[in-house]
């Protein structure tokens, strides 16, 4: 009987430890901004709201802007006019991001999504596929890099692929 009474504090501690679930870096909402360079001669900006679900899986709702620059034939280099007025698109979309790699203060996710928008003349659509790696900082801030590929439907480009760097800020709501 004495052995059981000595084990009670240990059993109660073990039960409390097992009943408390870990919530660190999980189930948060974030605002993110990313900028990147895409092949061929492209510049990309993405603003997004990310809602994290279980196990670092997440849904991302985003707005994207893209500019494809060209050389000005008369000046023989890129000018302000040839940068901003060559080809540009904007789009709105959603992406599912299942977590595929996790370790201390970092995790990686596939990014699978679709978006639609315009190239200022007609409706354009994209299938989005990529990989995103996140580094968790203090107070919920995150830095990330992303390798992305967009398959364009009815656009000037068929494929757009490149690297994006960005930051995610916690919204405070869980």
Residue map of PLM features:
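Bacterial N-terminal signal peptides that target proteins for export
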Residues: 2-11
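Gram-negative (and chloroplast) outer-membrane scaffold detector with strong preference
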Residues: 50-143
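Hydrophobic h-region of N-terminal signal peptides that target proteins for export
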Residues: 14-23
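Gram-negative outer-membrane beta-barrel domains
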Residues: 120, 130-174
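Short glycine/proline- and aromatic-enriched beta-strand/turn motifs that initiate or cap beta-hairpins
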Residues: 22-71, 162, 168-174
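Solvent-exposed loop/turn segments connecting transmembrane beta-strands
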Residues: 33-46, 86-88, 115-127, 151-160
